[in-house]
């Protein structure tokens, strides 16, 4: 099928993924340049006509978070002024998602602010993967397509025979139970939950309190939406090992991996950490314990279905990628 009126542009954060998606769809990446003035000010130039086209921008708001967000906003403004028919943002990793509520007095709800900024800039639709808090979809007055990474993670483990009653899918906290239950459904395993208490006065840290469920003599598969400093996932893995788990694997959609993350992973009971490529990882972060799998097919199919006005519901099923 011809996609002559479909354009896909990459900015700075996910160029390799964007190239793979464009190739899978059967189109060329749109021609554009992003540069910074000496004071850090961002300028975007679109180097081809997009008048009347349906345009998709692929960019995660990963580090540097603020630069990547500004690139999106400026690019959207440029596309709108150049008479694009529609502008959709494909944001595999939605930054600022952890600031989705007021945990303490006088705190902002920055997730809502970012949603407002995208809408005011002129975004017609947002496509993202595994929001840290699903209710962020409700911050938008435009359509939000919220894809799941669990089918891809399930495919990884099923292909290695890691499914059934000898395995347990573990949520590292109560907030991730729905995600863990979905993966457990795909892998046909029971689930367990780590009961933890987070120290609100110290960022990126949490304390493991208790394990709800039987993990003794089982291979455990931890699943989370993101891993930042890896303190939570490393402590959870160690707690599972102490509780009698025979092996501990971990998985996440978004490998933020900042600060001491690599040391925490390397020194933990985790045998293998499976991550998606919603965030580009430099070679030095791809240590032996980390294996990255691609969301290329998921994003490509989603873009095609949006462009052709077909439902995205099949993308939520494990059989789509099996």
Swiss-Prot record:
It is found in: Cytoplasm. It is an enzyme of class 2 (transferase). Transmembrane segments: none annotated. Keywords: ATP-binding, Cytoplasm, Kinase, Magnesium, Metal-binding, Nucleotide biosynthesis, Nucleotide-binding, Transferase. Mg(2+) 1 binds at residue 132. Binds 2 Mg(2+) ions per subunit. Its EC number is 2.7.6.1. Pathway: Metabolic intermediate biosynthesis; 5-phospho-alpha-D-ribose 1-diphosphate biosynthesis; 5-phospho-alpha-D-ribose 1-diphosphate from D-ribose 5-phosphate (route I): step 1/1. ATP binds at residues 39-41, 98-99. GO terms for biological process: 5-phosphoribose 1-diphosphate biosynthetic process; purine nucleotide biosynthetic process; ribonucleoside monophosphate biosynthetic process. One of its GO terms (molecular function) is ribose phosphate diphosphokinase activity. It comes from the Bacteria. It holds the Pfam family Pribosyl_synth. GO terms for cellular component: cytoplasm; ribose phosphate diphosphokinase complex. Mg(2+) 2 binds at residue 173. Its main location: cytoplasm. The active site is at residue 196. Involved in the biosynthesis of the central metabolite phospho-alpha-D-ribosyl-1-pyrophosphate (PRPP) via the transfer of pyrophosphoryl group from ATP to 1-hydroxyl of ribose-5-phosphate (Rib-5-P). PANTHER family: RIBOSE-PHOSPHATE DIPHOSPHOKINASE FAMILY MEMBER, RIBOSE-PHOSPHATE PYROPHOSPHOKINASE 1, CHLOROPLASTIC. Belongs to the ribose-phosphate pyrophosphokinase family. Class I subfamily. This is Ribose-phosphate pyrophosphokinase 1. It comes from Streptococcus mutans serotype c (strain ATCC 700610 / UA159). The lineage of its organism: Bacteria, Bacillati, Bacillota, Bacilli, Lactobacillales.
